[in-house]
């Protein structure tokens, strides 16, 4: 299942800011970048909305897999996991997260990816 719209991070400026972020946490198969919310980067209709959860995005490039089916399976797996982990966490409101999968992530078992996702959240101080 995909992330609900209230949890999705969208827009070129948001992604650019996250890529320049100094708060990066590296794992074997993915990188987590995080920043505090900056409403000026959001589209005008989203600026007035109150964030009740954190917003996150997932980047899975063609380097991970040339097959869209494989990339979409990874995306669905991680979206579902993040939704379950972060949906009820109101204490994280105002945090933006960007997960970028590394090229060799397609070779990892799904359980390994989910475990690494949890460990990166813990390292970032976002997991209880």
Curated annotation (Swiss-Prot):
One GO term (biological process): tRNA 5'-leader removal
Enzyme Commission numbers on file: 3.1.26.5
Enzyme class label: hydrolase
A GO molecular function held by the record: 3'-tRNA processing endoribonuclease activity
UniProt cross-references to SUPFAM superfamilies, sorted A to Z: Ribosomal protein S5 domain 2-like
Disulfide-bonded cysteines: none
InterPro entries named in the record: Ribosomal_Su5_D2-typ_SF, Ribsml_uS5_D2-typ_fold_subgr, RNase_P
Annotated catalysed reactions: Endonucleolytic cleavage of RNA, removing 5'-extranucleotides from tRNA precursor
Similarity-based family: Belongs to the RnpA family.
The protein's name in its UniProt record: Ribonuclease P protein component
Source organism (scientific name): Synechococcus sp. (strain CC9902)
Lineage: Bacteria, Bacillati, Cyanobacteriota, Cyanophyceae, Synechococcales
Gene that this polypeptide is encoded by: rnpA
């Amino acid at each position: 299942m995909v992330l609900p719209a209230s949890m999705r991070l969208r827009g070129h400026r948001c992604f650019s800011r996250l890529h320049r972020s100094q708060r990066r946490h590296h794992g074997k198969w993915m990188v987590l970048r995080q920043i505090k919310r900056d409403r000026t980067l959001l589209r005008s209709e989203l600026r007035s909305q109150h964030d009740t959860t954190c917003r996150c995005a997932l980047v899975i490039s063609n380097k991970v897999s040339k097959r869209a089916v494989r990339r979409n399976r990874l995306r669905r797996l991680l979206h579902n996991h993040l939704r379950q982990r972060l949906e009820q966490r109101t204490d994280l409101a105002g945090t933006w997260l960007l997960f970028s999968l590394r090229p060799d992530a397609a070779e990892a078992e799904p359980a390994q990816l989910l475990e690494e996702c949890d460990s990166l959240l813990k390292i970032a101080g976002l997991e209880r």
